[in-house]
């Protein structure tokens, strides 16, 4: 997520997607950055504007059983469901005048929501940059690939954490690597057939112990498939047992280091969290969480589906108290201790394959 708003990446996105910018959005962007800066200086949360980047969860259902994912491994305790199109549109109507980017995933497989392409199209028509992440199992026909392209989706991540079925299924439990390969091929061909530049296709490879030797071959597969980017990402774990099983032996591909206190995220402790100023997480039922690391919405800020409510939520007591707490001592929040946001390190690396 962070690389999208990094200083090196942002100018490229501004040039490519000039359509998403307006004076109102630019003013909001500047307001957010200024309030963030002031907050860091005075050590007290000041909030101007609203988040310029939104994360929206279309569904928290998933077809796979990935062992490190709360949705797949069954550890997620919150109710499951799909975001309704009506609630979604009302939320977009309220927030799109000032926000310019929508990351359309969280827990679950977005394309299990049958309205997903229509959701993307609605956001696109509102001038939002749209981005999603998928396990690639629902691009089964040429018509489905064309629907994705025609929706106006700007960018898509397709997860492919292996080069053969034996390796792939060790993490993507219940998945079929050939379906993913075929789906990516269909999407590349659909773009060519329709003469479309988007969506840009990212092939994502999460590095784990069982696949760490396949990175170069996976990149070659990405080139052969004709995708736009190859994304290498480190794995997030939640227990020592998971660490022993999944973290790569090659230290440069791990986001953690071992200490006397156990596993900790590499790098110097980070003060505060900028995400709490520029982004917000809206789950399928409208529950607003501070970010995507709050898997079970333990820190519910309010409901985005109550008409005109988001402005009050964004500056409400719950959000402000949480910002104050994180600004004072980020390590005091459990989920923040396992978060790489703001740290300098190789947590993800994007290689451009096509200009």
Q: Where are the regions a protein language model picked out?
A:
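Short, basic and Ser/Thr-rich N-terminal targeting/leader segments
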Residues: 52, 275-276, 332
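Short, charged low-complexity linear segments at domain edges
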Residues: 31-51, 303-324
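Processing junctions and N-termini across compartments
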Residues: 56, 60-63, 267, 330-333
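Local cysteine-cluster metal-coordination motifs and their immediate loop/turn environment
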Residues: 63-71, 290-293, 334-342
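Radical SAM enzyme [4Fe-4S]-AdoMet core and its adjacent flexible, acidic
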Residues: 1-16, 78-86, 126-129, 147-312, ...
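Generic structural signal for residues positioned in beta-strands
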Residues: 53, 202, 300, 335-338
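Conserved alpha-helical substructure of the radical SAM core
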Residues: 3-155, 170, 174-178, 182, ...
């Amino acid at each position: 997520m962070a690389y999208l708003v990094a200083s090196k990446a942002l100018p490229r996105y501004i040039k490519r997607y000039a359509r998403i910018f307006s004076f109102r959005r630019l003013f909001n962007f500047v307001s957010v950055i200024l309030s963030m800066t002031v907050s860091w200086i005075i050590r007290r949360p000041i909030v101007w504007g609203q988040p310029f980047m939104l994360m929206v969860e279309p569904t928290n259902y998933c077809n796979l059983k990935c062992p490190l994912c709360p949705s797949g491994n069954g550890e997620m305790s919150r109710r499951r469901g799909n975001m309704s199109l009506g609630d979604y549109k009302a939320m977009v109507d309220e927030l799109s005048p000032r926000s310019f980017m929508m990351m359309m995933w969280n827990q679950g497989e977005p394309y299990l929501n049958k309205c997903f392409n229509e959701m993307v199209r609605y956001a696109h028509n509102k001038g939002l940059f749209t981005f999603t992440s998928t396990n690639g199992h629902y691009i089964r026909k040429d018509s489905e690939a064309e629907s994705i392209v025609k929706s106006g989706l700007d960018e898509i991540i397709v997860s492919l954490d292996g080069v053969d079925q034996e390796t792939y299924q060790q993490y993507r439990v219940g998945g079929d690597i050939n379906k993913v390969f075929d789906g990516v091929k269909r999407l590349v061909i659909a773009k060519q057939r329709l003469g479309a530049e988007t969506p840009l296709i990212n092939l994502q490879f999460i590095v784990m112990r069982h696949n760490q030797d396949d990175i170069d071959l996976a990149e070659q597969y990405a080139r052969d498939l004709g995708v736009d980017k190859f994304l290498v990402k480190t794995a997030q774990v939640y227990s020592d047992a998971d660490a022993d099983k999944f973290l790569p032996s090659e230290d440069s591909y791990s986001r953690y280091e071992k200490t006397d206190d156990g596993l900790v995220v590499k790098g110097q402790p980070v003060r505060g969290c900028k995400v709490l100023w520029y982004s917000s997480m809206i789950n399928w039922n409208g529950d607003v969480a501070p970010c995507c690391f709050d898997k079970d919405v333990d820190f519910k800020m309010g409901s985005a589906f109550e008409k005109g409510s988001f402005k009050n939520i964004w500056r409400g007591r719950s959000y402000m108290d949480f910002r104050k707490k994180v600004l004072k001592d980020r390590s005091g929040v459990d989920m923040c201790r396992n978060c790489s946001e703001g740290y300098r390190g190789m947590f993800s690396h994007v290689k451009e394959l096509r200009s």
